[in-house]
């Protein structure tokens, strides 16, 4: 009887430790706020949000945005 209680306890301990490993290795999905690229799933943190890929607008896009606001 004591052997069964010990083995069940060990089994539950292993399951608990595996759940903790999954939680600590979880990455942030696209659109989530981030502070560094390593925390995002696609390893791309742009302007404090996870995006894939990291697109930086060029002069043409900024000019279109300027005229759109007028």
UniProtKB/Swiss-Prot annotation:
Q: Which GO terms describe its molecular function?
A: toxin activity
Give the pro-peptide residues.
61-70
Chief localisation class:
secreted
Q: Where is the protein situated, by its record's location annotation?
A: Secreted
In terms of InterPro entries, this protein maps to: Conotoxin-I_CS, Conotoxin_I2
Cellular component terms per the entry's GO annotation: extracellular region
Instruction: Spell out which residues are annotated as carrying Proline amide.
Output: 57
Q: Disulfide connectivity? A: 27-41, 34-46, 40-50, 45-54
State the signal peptide span: 1-26
Question: Keywords, A to Z?
Answer: Amidation, Cleavage on pair of basic residues, Disulfide bond, Secreted, Signal, Toxin
What tissue specificity is annotated for this entry? Expressed by the venom duct.
| Family to which the UniProt record says this protein belongs | Belongs to the conotoxin I2 superfamily.
Q: What is known of its domains?
A: The cysteine framework is XI (C-C-CC-CC-C-C).
- Listed name of the protein: Conotoxin Ep11.12
Q: Which organism is it from?
A: Conus episcopatus
